[in-house]
Amino acid sequence: MASAFEYAPAPESRSVVDIAPSYGLFIDGEFVEAADGKVFKTVSPASEEVLSEVARAGTEDVDRAVKAARRAFEKWSALPGSERAKYLFRIARIIQERSRELAVLETLDNGKPIRETRDADLPLVAAHFFYYAGWADKLDHAGYGANPRPLGVAGQVIPWNFPLLMLAWKIAPALATGNTVVLKPAETTPLSALFFADICRQAGLPKGVVNILPGYGDAGAALVGHPDVNKVAFTGSTAVGKAIARSVAGTDKKLTLELGGKGANIVFDDAPIDQAVEGIVTGIFFNQGQVCCAGSRLLVQESIQDELLDSLKRRLSTLRLGDPLDKNTDIGAINSSEQLARITTLVEQGEAEGAERWSAACDLPSAGYWFAPTLFTNVTQAHTVARDEIFGPVLSVLTFRTPDEAVAKANNSQYGLSAGIWTEKGSRILAVAGKLRAGVVWANTFNKFDPTSPFGGYKESGFGREGGRHGLEAYLDV
């Protein structure tokens, strides 16, 4: 994109990670072929280059993995918490040691900038394993009664936007509490989960405690519906989450759902404009807006609308879109052709409905899946771009006059995952935050995460909490 500064390329070396030409399923501590021999290709979204060929799990493979996890559960759950903690600490340290390798791998398979995988994702991944390792021998003091018991086998399905981080969010508390795991990564981003399987072997984790099944929706459905799975945890789209909720209804499975969002970022007239602009950019353009808690709705007080939008457009014009492995890149590739098509369709619908589109001027690479940072003005609550989760680098701008109007507009959504408040008045932050129906509310910042803090939503954003002490409950019989 156009910028006041020219940056020489500063690419991270791809050679730091060795991607095998093919990968199997990870079942009972071994990499094995799918029972029916099916495979699929995983592609770099920045170049459309085939990275590797991966075994595709089917129903028979799910059954094998669940049986392996059930066998492992008997010994794993009987281990003292201090012994389970040793494995988690070991995994965390190996992740730190291999963080550069994992960051490059995640960027290649997902498309997000290397700065984000290196500086945000990987430190948080290790932190989650360190954090829950600390809880493993303290479960009696977590507030869930004496001797809380693990549930059994956890079936976990994770999305493509934060593959390794979502894996850590789910596997770390499950193992700390004595459960065993069968995890299905997204079909577009299976590689980091398979590398994690190798880390489990490197850490000496007992066979069957963690099983990784790359595959498509049929494998996920088989896992969720397996009669010997005691716990289901899903992060992904609201539509799939609803289907999962229906499928486990009437069973004794425990369920956690973290689904879509349409987060409101509220900027009051006393907010420092430059600081707010940086928060807005972080809120919606981090990971190309492919974040469930993205601040995709900007609610700005009318009196500062023009000033803030001018500043925001100037800032967007300095963002650099391109090679995700370049350390200077701000905006990487969209994860898949299907997701790019969805973003394009919703943006075109926004224009057709009368919202005014502004996109940063930039040259999109000829190969790969790309979308320029975009914002819509003259948006009403009725516009599709104000209601639907686009899951891309697209910001919808609405205005308000009073705090009550801001709260009403922010809450006028089927989702309730996240929100942000920008103001210099602490009393206003507390008053507004208390009225927002959102699982997490950031004050004068956005998209900040910590393993000690619970995360989850209301309404169609799901239920249950991941992270913090609260994240233990999802994997305990309490």
Annotate each language-model stretch with its function.
Residues S47-E53, L205, V229, I266, ...:
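Conserved C-terminal structural/oligomerization subdomain of aldehyde/semialdehyde dehydrogenase
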Residues V50-A57, A72-A78, Q156, N265-F268, ...:
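Short, well-ordered beta-strand elements within core beta-sheets of diverse protein domains
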Residues M1-E53, K86, R90, A127, ...:
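Terminal low-complexity tails and localization/encapsulation signals of metabolic enzymes
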